[in-house]
Amino acid sequence: MEAILRAVDAPYLEKAVYPPKLVGMKDGSKIVVRQASRAEAPEVLKAVRLYVDVNKDFYDIVAWRTYAEILAWKMYRIKDHYLLLGIQDDKLVGIVNARMWDQNIAISLHTMSFKRGIDVGPALYFAKMEHAFDHLGAREWWATFESYIGLRIMGTEWAPKQKPFPEMQHELGGSRIFYTTKEDWENFVKLKYARYLGEKPVPKDLLAKSQKFRIPEKADV
């Protein structure tokens, strides 16, 4: 039965691992952005659980949905999913996830910042778009937004277009699809937000430190 139920990742996803980088934050610090492994899912889930009862800025619904997605990934019940981490020193300060619908379309899932006010969310959102377009070969990025903050920043300032609604609906609850093409990425997003491209390679000591991250002690809201 497991062979029937298991969501097996496409070979191209396994070959294209996100290259770690350092990205500067508003407070002058730098975070390591790297791809998570399934073995790290239980620890990431502990961080997400801190927000499931936070009734502010839609953290609760985002946390519950993100928890379900990462748990599904851990248990091989979501296909072609990837999870990126933002780590400041040795502390987990944010996560983003997405999945490939096919080799042409990437589906944005969720963005969670565990440290507010330093630009973690947009930096990580940029990183998951970067992975889809530059490493996995996507032609379009399909996003939707549950929070006003996400809609205001990535859904407005980053100038995505919209698919016809309700004729076309995002897999997250049948909501509106905000999409960015490969051309939009190269000619606008990547240029305007080039600061999020960061520095590569990550120094070995910082990368090693990021491998054993600590989760936040409490929700930062």
Roles of regions detected by a PLM:
Residues 117-133:
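Conserved acetyl-CoA-binding loop-helix of GNAT-fold acetyltransferases
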Residues 161-164, 180, 188-203:
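Acidic, small-residue rich beta-repeat scaffolds with periodic aromatic anchors
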Residues 35-38, 48-106, 111-113:
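A conserved beta-strand-loop-helix scaffold within acyl/acetyltransferase catalytic domains
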Residues 144-145, 160-181:
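Conserved catalytic-core motifs of GNAT/GCN5-like acyltransferases
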Residues 1-39, 195-221:
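Conserved N-terminal entry element of GNAT/NAT acetyltransferase domains
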Residues 81, 136-138:
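Short, high-confidence coil segments that cap the C-terminus of an alpha-helix
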Residues 44-45:
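Glycine-rich short-loop/terminal segments
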Residues 141-156:
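Conserved beta-strand-loop-alpha-helix junction that forms the acyl-donor binding cleft
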